Amino acid sequence: MRQVVLDTETTGLDIANDHRIIEIAGVELVNRKLTKNSYQVYLNPERTVGPSFKIHGLSDDFLSDKPSFKEIYEEFLDFIKDSELLIHNAEFDVGFLNHELKL
């Protein structure tokens, strides 16, 4: 069984306020054992990071030359394809991922 432990960082807590994903990270488990397969990307949110900088330390300047979600979504979907996703606070992360996929 393939599983992916997944986490995101965002510019804030609410997609209704135009907050965006700024980092996606995942590690692969096969039969509940960690493999060397992982995925990590920083993203340009195309907006300011704001006060969330105090939480994750990712600055506007650091993110300015990173790809947008639109530029990486296919490789991200390939990484998680055919996997059970293990996500702490899944409603939050999945909500943001679904929002990004609609943009």
Predicted segments with their positions:
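Conserved non-catalytic scaffold segment of RNase H-like nuclease domains
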Residues: 1-103
